[in-house]
């Protein structure tokens, strides 16, 4: 009933807003035609409000995907990128902690609501969650650093405790998840990654884990560039890196780009880093496994 009311409200809002959006779009198109330098006060006003119009132009981020290939199972041609499928399947067969993960799920009703993990979290869903838990159990890291935290933090924290090692868990989360401070077994940095000193990552050693789930967007002097050009190249040999929301060898899902209007591009700098390299190797590409080796992945 509540969902039906919500749908009706959204339909009414669409009808009411449509003429205003149309008129605003015409005005903003004129603004972009004249250019922000010619209209500095209007440009400043848009920055204060926190919104800026994009044009359908080859110099700007893409937001129209009329010709986008929707075949999610179609692998892109990525010359020089070794996905190592045999190694990935071997890893899946070696990880056998699903019973412990089920115990982790059953324990969630004993926790405060904001500290409990559930699959209806909008961040890390089935498949990703099971793999992350199993991988932490399998890897048994002494130290984990998360860049971007949330439901993954709950999974990692539980897996580390079950490993029964004196592990260190550091979370870098400047924007969200106010409940992090309630978790006594983690150290929280409430600082944008761009301002975190890179020597924080010097503690990571062989078989430790760096988990990345940050802005997903390449920006000048932004977090993604710091991760891939400053932090990752300086890591000690044998450190494992888990990057969330990667769909290699496919593109990002069309619904994410066309419906949710996400401008994410992190995946492509990661693919460039992994192309024709002996420095890094792919351990697991979950979207690839799901689309090409589903029976092995499902186990």
Model-derived features: where do they sit?
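A short alpha-helical cap/connector motif
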Residues: 2-162, 166-242, 246-299
């Amino acid at each position: 009933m509540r969902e039906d009311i919500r749908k009706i409200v959204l339909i009414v809002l669409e009808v009411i807003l449509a003429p205003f959006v149309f008129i605003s779009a015409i005005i903003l198109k004129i603004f972009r035609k004249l250019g922000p330098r010619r209209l500095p006060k209007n440009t400043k006003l848009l920055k204060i409000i926190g919104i800026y119009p994009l044009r359908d132009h080859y110099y700007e981020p893409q937001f129209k995907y009329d010709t986008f290939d929707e075949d999610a199972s179609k692998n892109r041609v990525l010359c020089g990128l070794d996905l190592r499928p045999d190694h990935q399947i071997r890893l899946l067969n070696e990880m056998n902690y699903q019973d412990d993960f089920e115990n982790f799920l059953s324990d969630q009703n004993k926790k405060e609501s904001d500290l409990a993990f559930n699959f209806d979290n909008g961040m890390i869903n089935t498949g990703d969650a099971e793999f992350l838990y199993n991988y932490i159990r399998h890897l048994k890291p002494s130290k984990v650093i998360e860049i971007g935290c949330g439901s993954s933090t709950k999974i990692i924290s539980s897996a580390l405790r079950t490993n029964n090692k004196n592990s260190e868990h550091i979370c870098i989360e400047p924007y969200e998840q106010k409940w992090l401070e309630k978790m006594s077994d983690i150290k929280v940095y409430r600082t944008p990654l761009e301002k975190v000193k890179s020597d924080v990552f010097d503690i990571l050693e062989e078989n430790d884990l760096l988990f990345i789930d940050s802005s997903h967007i390449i920006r000048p002097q932004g977090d993604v560039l710091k991760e891939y050009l400053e932090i990752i190249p300086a890591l000690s040999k044998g450190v494992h890196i888990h990057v969330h929301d990667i769909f290699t060898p496919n593109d990002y899902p069309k619904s994410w780009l066309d419906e949710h209007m996400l401008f994410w591009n992190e995946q492509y700098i990661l693919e460039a880093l992994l192309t024709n390299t002996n420095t890094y190797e792919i351990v697991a590409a979950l979207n690839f496994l799901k689309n090409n080796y589903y029976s092995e992945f499902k186990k």
